Amino acid sequence: MTFFFAANPEEAGARLRVVDAFQRKHPDIKVRTLLSGPDALQHVSIYCAGGKCPDVLMAWEFTYAGLAERGVLLDLNTMLAHEKTFAAELRADSVGSLYETFTFNGGQYAFPEQWSGTFLYFNKKLFAEAGVRPPPGRWDEQWSYAEFLDAAAALTKRDRSGRVSQWGFVDTWAPYYSALMFGMNNGVPWSDPRLNPTHLNFDDAAFIDGIQFYADLNNKYRVAPTASESQSMSQTDLFTSGHAAMALGGHWRYQTLERATDLDFDIAVLPTGPKGHAARSNIGTTGLAIASSSPRKKQAWEFVKFATGPVGQAVIAETGLFVPALRSAVRSPEFAKAHTRIGNIAVLTGGPSHAEGLPVTPQWPKIVALMDRNLGPVLRGSRPAVSLTDGLGPKIDEVLRTP
């Protein structure tokens, strides 16, 4: 049986622990792993177009719908129909919003294996030295965009020449995604509806205001570096080296930060805009799917059940590499033990249930290309965010309406 996934070296090691645990339980099923290249969607498309689709595939929330629409992925409901007990246990232990992320046109095309939403890392030492109160460590506690900006300003330091020696905020995620997160946290979802949307909310004033606030962090308020200002050092390195007080990112950064032995950090919730109602993250997630053309569906099914079920999720919890998708695993002592450097563990354990869904559509690759071109000038400060209402919104909606 072949298993296709994407991973950096640390992630690959943790995934192989799941594979090893599976093979100890199922010695009759041999697993051959296939590590993706830089573009996972293109890589798997080449495999499948050539008639060599892997039996089990890692699936991403943004791109799986296109594969499902083309018939590449098996509807797992066809397997669940014969496993009523497992189906009931999985649904009971799953966070509904994560599970439903992989539901498309009535089919269930993957089971979630992790939550990879975003939050804030912050440098405890820098906050203490500046006399700034640490940000909230629970999703039921809010802090406003104004409070976030005040903290970032207080934590930005300049030398006598005006050169910045310490930034208040850096972003280790994709900037245009982060900008839309700030729009979402101003009280507006990305799309209506979430699954198979026909419209993205670039015509909503509150959504646009959130994007503008994010762009202003570096262009107007100067509390975050521009792209050119961070060319000599990555945003992640700025944080790990103590040259930034806050960093937007996800759990995928934890392994890197944990290795920075001189860094005293914790995590916090994202700020909420004036039109927002509660602190929210995004439903970032990956799952495991089965190729519809697989000649080894039975073996693939056993692996997917294992990896996304209680035993495999417990292995993931012990590694500390992912935030497991099952409640039992994410709330386990083993998961907490793997995160001893984090005090605000509730940001992770409560993240999946305090996350807003991002759009699920087969057209997402085309939308990303449009956003990349149109959001760039806004994030660089050469255009206002309101220009997206007429400049980007109609283009995206046209793509969504075109089969």
Role assignments for model-derived ranges:
Residues 1-72, 82-91, 134, 228, ...:
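Conserved N-terminal structural module of periplasmic/extracytoplasmic solute-binding proteins
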Residues 20-24, 30, 106, 130, ...:
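Extracytoplasmic/periplasmic substrate-recognition and gating elements
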Residues 46, 54-55, 86-127, 277-280, ...:
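A structural signal for short loop-to-beta-strand junctions that line the ligand-binding cleft
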Residues 62-119, 182-183, 266-268, 337-339:
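Hinge/lid segment of periplasmic solute-binding proteins
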Residues 77-93, 137-141, 159-161, 165-168, ...:
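Short, solvent-exposed loop/beta-turn-alpha elements that line the ligand-binding surface or hinge
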Residues 103-113, 118, 128, 144-199, ...:
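Extracytoplasmic/periplasmic solute-binding protein
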Residues 150-153, 196-228, 270:
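Glycine-centered hinge/linker elements that transmit conformational signals in sensory
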Residues 268, 318-373, 377, 402:
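Long, aromatic- and glycine/proline-rich binding clefts that accommodate carbohydrate-like moieties
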